[in-house]
């Protein structure tokens, strides 16, 4: 079988690529620098609750890129999924059902009827256009079509962007937004359904993929930090790895797949002058981050039967409340309930403990105003302030084909996957899509 293909990173992008290659009989070795699988989706157990590293969700359910990979591998039954379909808005006059399709917009009680018609006039052309045409809008901000809308309709767009992109509308490419609307349109073969692993922890997806790789005699190693990719005469010849004990080892390799942000890899893993400086500078512009403050709350009882609630309006700091235990009770011990609330923030706030505390206090107070039982039922809270890298998949001028290519011209045996590379979709769906696009290129190289 020869020298194994080396995949750097055990997130969704790396593991879907490794699994697809394993399914075709290739020997694969996955190296992950942390102690856990899943990359940014790695979960943890805290006081017997399963906490995700932020709120993760599988968009488009069985139409998602992740599910299509599992289906191709014939292991979709290995991942039991819970539907996420009980979603609502909350405004000053109460709760309003989230539209599950284009036609549901006519029944959207959140908006006056005239606003619903305006919304349909915007969304219908997007929903029925082609993926190819959306590329014309990739450099255009979504706000170009929302700026002149009334405040209620703008608030609707903000909530949709929070669910789909975990960000505000001014950071979203119109092209990426349109592709999301197309893929949610059942008349175009899409679905607006979402899903979450029924056993709890979004990294369950990564563990299913890892198990498949191991079943095909592949290898998955944690605590293995790749320090260098060696390129000689325009070909990959090996990697230098540091293990948990601190010792370095040279591993021969003629095919290496990098599955963490390309703009980091280009600056960290190669000797100077291996990669053209202009190319590196071009990719470095993709290094844009969105910062988020999120808080897990554990409660003594259920305060709502819904799964997701979006407070609507500029007066709310809290942009989303996710009732994880209502999606699947497996994330919590018996008799307790887990929710997570979050809001995007400026990056500098994540380094300011006082600012973090102030925002957490505001979110707690807002949830209490919506749910009077919240404070009396609260057991504990666990704030998190962190920076995302997946914002690169949604900003104008930094989406779809403007992202890092899967190969660098002139270097054989080197490939890049993940949501920072050519792909579209939301978060991990984008990472899996990149694997679907890149895997045939790797196969072609291996046959050459």
What are these regions (language model features)?
Residues 49-131:
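Dinucleotide-binding Rossmann-like beta1-alpha1 core, especially the glycine-rich loop
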Residues 324-448:
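Conserved flavin/dinucleotide-binding core of flavoenzymes
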Residues 22-47:
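Glycine-rich FAD pyrophosphate-binding loop
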Residues 227-337, 405:
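Mid-domain catalytic core of redox enzymes
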Residues 183-247:
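Helical element adjacent to the flavin cofactor pocket in flavoenzyme catalytic cores
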Residues 57-62, 134-138, 188-212, 353-359:
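Short beta-strand to alpha-helix junction loop
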Residues 92, 107-183, 196:
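Rossmann-like flavin
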Residues 3-30:
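N-terminal Rossmann-like FAD-binding beta1-loop-alpha1 element of flavoenzymes
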